[in-house]
């Protein structure tokens, strides 16, 4: 009854934050039980508001029929994005990455890049690192938000970016990634496909549990 009352007073994005915190603090089975008690459309709207990696974590424990049921109630872009991540093999970079990151083009000016950052910052899981891509969406560099803020608006991104950027492939094992992040003190790592296209990021928070196990 108390949970049902909470549902009525919180918006889907507020519930998404609450559910995400519960999943982090407690067993995901408890969160799945809470979702199951909700109206399916409301539960789907909560999953749609969550960061993709968190939504995938919860959905991956459900049976196929339940997954399809929730995805069918989301908008097409969101459901396809989650379905794509669900197809990656468990415990690989692809299965734990989030697609909510900020990327800019290397041929942009700092001024235009900052406009994009301001527009996308609210939905991004991490804004400290800004990843740079070429015209083929291949990862070519990285810079910090501070780099952008202190640079002149007319400076080109390719002049400012650090071209020595460490990345992992979608098929890399999560324990290998955790070791790299721990050894090099990274707070995030970009994930690329086999053509070096930037497809997601993995944050330090996502890897804490894995780091305790290695």
What is each stretch, according to the model?
Residues 1-214:
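Hydrophobic packing positions in regular secondary-structure scaffolds
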């Amino acid at each position: 009854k108390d949970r049902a009352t909470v549902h009525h007073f919180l918006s889907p994005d507020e519930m998404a934050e609450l559910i995400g915190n519960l999943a982090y603090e407690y067993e995901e089975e408890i969160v799945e039980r809470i979702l199951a008690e909700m109206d399916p459309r409301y539960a789907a709207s909560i999953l749609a508001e969550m960061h993709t990696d968190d939504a995938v974590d919860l959905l991956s424990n459900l049976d196929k029929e339940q997954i399809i049921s929730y995805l069918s109630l989301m908008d097409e872009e969101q459901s396809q994005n989650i379905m794509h991540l669900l197809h990656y093999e468990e415990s690989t970079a692809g299965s734990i990455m989030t697609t909510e990151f900020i990327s800019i083009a290397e041929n942009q000016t700092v001024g235009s890049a900052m406009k994009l950052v301001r527009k996308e910052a609210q939905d991004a899981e991490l804004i400290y690192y800004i990843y740079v891509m070429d015209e083929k969406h291949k990862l070519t560099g990285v810079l910090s938000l501070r780099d952008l803020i202190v640079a002149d608006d007319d400076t080109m991104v390719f002049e400012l970016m650090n071209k020595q950027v460490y990345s992992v492939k979608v098929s890399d094992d999560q324990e290998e990634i955790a070791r790299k992040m721990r050894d090099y003190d990274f707070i995030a790592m970009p994930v690329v496909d086999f053509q070096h296209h930037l497809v997601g990021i993995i944050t330090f928070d996502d890897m804490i549990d894995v780091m305790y196990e290695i």
